[in-house]
Amino acid sequence: MIAPAKLTLSLRVTGVRADGFHLIDAEMVSLDIADELIITDATSTTIVVTGPYADGVPTDETNIVHKALALCGRTAHVSIVKNIPHGGGLGGGSTDAAAVLRWAQFTDVGASATVGADVPFCLVGGRAQVKGIGEIIEPLPFEEKKITLFIPPIHVSTPAVYQAWDRLGGPKGDNGNDLEPAALHAYPELQAWKNSIEDAVQQKAFLAGSGATWFALGHTQLDSARLAGVQVVYASTRPG
């Protein structure tokens, strides 16, 4: 099974629920970078991870795939080839979980949010406006776009970014992403990476959701000497 990466093109925080969960209004798209999964029924769940981005991906119960299988009441052996960079905000874990739900023919998009906030979008895929805490998916017409991804060597905690957003009083982001000022506050080194990326490509870089991935529209020419340590990935949007 193919599990495409997702990219958050824009994100507005529209409120905070009484339980502390943040409400969003975001545009998300699927990319042509994808993990590959082989899933077979088994008496207990096991996960094997290989591929260029396998390092750091857990194979125990902390892997979100376990939660997806528990939701649909199944156990399986899951072999994952990780082609999506880990920890950069591209939905690598969520899309693997969504692939498992598709394999199990689980179609309750709202319930899939109990596995993870990005799982509902990954279950639907394509291009969509995503609202609520991620469980409301409003499909949008597909738009073909070429995108250059810049993945710095830093892991960003999404909860930490939302906590920073709260502490800052709920700032609005100038670039269509309300989490960008919060991410830059929580992880000041992200600003240096943004500056280096914009210098290298001579155009604006946008933060993907809470980060740490930055992106630029188009397949950009760049001065790679300015981007030591940054993974540069050329991607395109894909239909669901």
What are these model-derived regions, one by one?
Residues 2, 10-26, 107-205, 217-240:
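ATP-dependent small-molecule kinase catalytic core of the GHMP/sugar-kinase superfamily
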Residues 88-109, 113:
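DPxDG-like acidic metal-binding loop motif
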Residues 92-93, 207-212:
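Glycine-rich beta-strand-to-loop/alpha-helix junction loops that act as flexible
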Residues 1-88, 106, 133, 151:
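ATP-binding N-lobe of GHMP and related small-molecule kinases
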Residues 65-68, 101, 187, 214-218:
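Short, hydrophobic beta-strand segments that form beta-sheet elements in well-ordered domains
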Residues 85-87, 120, 212-215:
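Short, active-site-adjacent cap segments at secondary-structure transitions
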